[in-house]
Amino acid sequence: MNFRTEIKLGTAPFEINYQHEVMLVGSCFSGHMGDKLKEMKMNVSSNPFGISFNPHSIAHSISRIIENKEYSAVENFNNLYFSFDHHSSFSLLTKEETLMKINIALHEAHNKLKQANFLFITFGSAWVYRHTAQNRLVANCHKIPNKEFSKELLSIENITTLFNALIGDLKAFNPLLNVVFTVSPVRHLKDGFIENQRSKSILLESVHRIVEANFNCSYF
């Protein structure tokens, strides 16, 4: 008797070898993949902005990496300086240290993405949080009270429009880049079972539409 679901994987439309440069961005699933590739001694860099779950924040971080536009301002809460675009691992006690850490990672990512052969983008959730006072979507709420945010669900149209444009920017920046999309299997049950399923459905359909519309893009 078989107590598990076995999935037979087809042959991928690409091959990665030890000469290739690989960058991974997105949810914690991308971090796990990056760790596995590093264990295999592959040339890998992952999450230069830290873990990010929603497609909007992921796209924003990639655009910022392409532009190589430095950060000059950060927020402050609970005696820590932080960026709404970054994971809390970038939060430090002084503004200067925080900006330095953020901008060093930004410049390194710009150079690595320029040379990369593969970019893995992992979506985690279509649910996003908007900071009400600043009217902006954030990658991380940094434990700021919930009352300062509103919760929204990204649409398939929003995600596909955003990434179809981004793919064009990526190809102009690095014509040899192959983009591989994944959707994290990790369930976000804090959103609720049904809400998690809605989110994953939106992400999967969005990814397949993006892949079908763009050359050198694939789904894994």
Language-model segment annotations:
Residues 1-220:
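Extracellular glycan-modifying ectodomains
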